[in-house]
Amino acid sequence: MASNHKSSAPRPISRGGIGLTGRPPSGIRPPSGNVRVATAMPPTTARPGSRGGPLGTGGVLSSQIKVADRPVTQQGLSGMKTGMKGPQRQILDKSYYLGLLRSKISELTTEINKLQKEIEMYNQENSVYLSYEKRAETLAVEIKDFQGQLADYNMLVDKLNTNTEMEEVMSDYNMLKAQNDRETQSMDVIFTERQAKEKQIRSVEEEVEQEKQAADGIIKNMSPEKQVKYIEMKTTNEKLLQELDTLQQQLDSLNMKKESLETEIAHSQVKQEAVLLYEKLYELESHRDQMIAEDKSMGSPMEERERLLKQVKEDNQEIASMERQLTDIKEKINQFSEEIRQLDMDLEEHQGEMNQKYKELKKREENMDAFIETFEETKNQELERKAQIEASIITLLEHCSRNINRMKQISSITNQELKMMQDDLSFKSTEMQKSQTTARNLTSDSQRLQLDLQKMELLESKMTEEQQSLKNKIKQMTADLETYSDLAALKSSAEEKKKKLHQERTVLSTHRNAFKKIMEKLTSDYDTLKRQLQDNETHAQLTNLERKWQHLEQNNFVMKEFIATKSQESDYQPVIKNVMKQIAEYNKTIMDALHNASRS
């Protein structure tokens, strides 16, 4: 069919009247209005303007028209209507856009191929880079091995230079090997311990997480009032912890300040005495305040008697309440024993929360047993306390009776005598205040005079030392004057000393020349030995071994530092303490919650 017959190449430029293998433009009408070009001709008949037949006669257009491709539809060919007629008209039909699309597709294909080549080149470069990197790593390992061998050779050269025997070298080697083996074993032990501790920490963290989940479950199962109370207690706990941190910081700062003050006081005798006096003053003031408070708290004998009777009644009520609590506790023990038996029966069926409740009840039972065991002792203590209180009541009653008799005697005193006694008391109090101020003034004067005395003693010691030094100088100058007064003896001794020094100079010059010759000979021998040693391969190996030994020493030091840092990193004691503290807090919170739940 005509719709399946497409031209793969662009259409040639055609002219009217020229017998080319192209079809006429689709926009040209046929010469006759009665004749219509068939759109669905059989394959045997050729269409006008197609490859199968000659070009139709038409001289409608005298100019060339460029057509990209022939439009093909299901019903054959259809021309495009143009907006204007005339020469050089371009038809932008479907074939034009298809050709344009093909050109763009070819450009995109070339660009994609170009990018694909660049990607392949990049991948090749990347693979080469990876191979180079691997090769560099292997070469670095080889260099490290060679450095180790070089250090060994340097150490060997050093041993040869120092004329070390082979047995000593082997003993050093064995010692280093044993030390390295021990350090390797210790590192392995530390590593295994660290793994075990990390595993233990993970298990503890899991247990803590489980306890947290259990606590969250208990909190969720609480009533809203208890949840609100729990949240309030939690916030209060956080606030108290913050206050504890701040108070701890303040305590640390005060302790540091105290230590600095103590060190400052330790170097000063006057400050130590002042501290002792302040402590004594503080004790006296506290004793005075205590006596004043006791005097104020002491009432009349009747009030004391009533207070003691009230205290006896309160103690009796407390003993009765304790007995009632004891009976209640016994009833609770029986009840809990029944619950424990029931829990023992249901323990195999119900695990988890029931097991936890069983443990709590078991613990509560142990606490109650301990209370019952210590009840007799506490009871005896309370009875002894009661007897002591009764004895004190009796003594106070006797004291009250004596005071009453004394008050009766005092009541017989006249107002004039009482006024005289009050005046005497005020006079004595003023005298006491004056004596206290005098004592304070005398204390300050004593301290000031002690300071002056210390200064005077210091000056006296300095003057004594200076006087002694001046006496020594006078003695030395007197001896020098006696020596320098005899000039003839000084000249003769100087001449003798000069002759002796000349003789020593000549002897030392001869020795110097001899030693110079010996030194030149030794220097030449040293140079020859040095050249021989430099040419010797063993010396070169020993030098290399010495360098390798230094490298090993450096590596050993680095490994020791690494082991020390890892040991510090693997210190798990603070973590364990923190975890155990949190576990104890969570357990306490859960116990309190369960206790409140059981009460409610």
Curated annotation (Swiss-Prot):
The modification Phosphothreonine is found at residue 73. Keywords: Cell projection, Cilium, Cilium biogenesis/degradation, Coiled coil, Cytoplasmic vesicle, Developmental protein, Flagellum, Methylation, Phosphoprotein. Residues 1-64 are annotated as: Disordered. It is found in: Cell projection, Cilium; Cytoplasmic vesicle; Cell projection, Cilium, Flagellum; Cytoplasmic vesicle, Secretory vesicle, Acrosome. One of its GO terms (cellular component) is acrosomal vesicle. Residues 1-90 are annotated as: Basic region. The keyword Phosphoprotein applies. One of its GO terms (molecular function) is beta-tubulin binding. Component of the intraflagellar transport (IFT) complex B: together with IFT81, forms a tubulin-binding module that specifically mediates transport of tubulin within the cilium. Binds beta-tubulin via its basic region. Required for ciliogenesis. Essential for flagellogenesis during spermatogenesis. This is Intraflagellar transport protein 74 homolog.
